[in-house]
Curated annotation (Swiss-Prot):
Organism from which the protein derives: Psychrobacter cryohalolentis (strain ATCC BAA-1226 / DSM 17306 / VKM B-2378 / K5)
HAMAP family assigned: Ribosomal_uL16
Record keywords: Ribonucleoprotein, Ribosomal protein, RNA-binding, rRNA-binding, tRNA-binding
Gene Ontology terms: biological process: translation
Subunit structure: Part of the 50S ribosomal subunit.
GO function terms (MF aspect): rRNA binding; structural constituent of ribosome; tRNA binding
Cited InterPro entries: Ribosomal_uL16, Ribosomal_uL16_bact-type, Ribosomal_uL16_CS, Ribosomal_uL16_dom, Ribosomal_uL16_sf
Family statement: Belongs to the universal ribosomal protein uL16 family.
One GO location term (cellular component): cytosolic large ribosomal subunit
Gene that specifies this protein: rplP
Function text: Binds 23S rRNA and is also seen to make contacts with the A and possibly P site tRNAs.
Protein name: Large ribosomal subunit protein uL16
Length: 137
């Protein structure tokens, strides 16, 4: 599963997920992509589950780009522990997703197969998505 090799600090504040995605909001590498419509968090497990789904559907054809990386640690205190005594240990890693962010990109397969693969992958994610094509400039 994806997680940073090393970080400056082990734990992070919760923060607020506001605004729209301006960076990473266009299909840059492939021909067709999966774009978020709502905001949320995408865990490393969800990124991997969606990637596996796409890989199984396209069967060794084409290329996949994963445009998100889980770089935010989420901590959790053990069950039945009283309040206080410090922040809990890191449980898993997430990526904060803003509306408009491209999550996955595909190339080298038919558009119909790509749409099917991305639709299956979208079912694994906790927010609404849409399929977008690359715009030629």
């Amino acid at each position: 599963m994806l997680q940073p090799k090393r970080t400056k600090f082990r734990k992070m504040h919760k923060g607020r997920n506001t605004g729209l995605a301006h960076r990473g909001s266009t299909v840059a590498f492939g021909q067709i992509g999966l774009k978020s419509l709502t905001r949320g968090r995408m865990t490393a497990r969800q990124i991997e589950a969606a990637r596996r789904t796409i890989t199984r559907k396209i069967k060794r054809g084409g290329k996949i780009w994963i445009r998100v990386f889980p770089d935010k640690p989420i901590t959790n205190k053990p069950l039945e522990v009283r309040m206080g005594k410090g922040k809990g240990p890191v449980e898993y890693w997430v990526c904060e997703i803003k509306p408009g962010k491209i999550l996955y990109e595909l190339e080298g397969i038919s558009e119909e197969l790509a749409r099917e693969a991305l639709t299956l992958a979208a079912a694994k994610l906790p927010f609404k998505t849409t399929i977008v094509k690359r715009t030629i400039m």
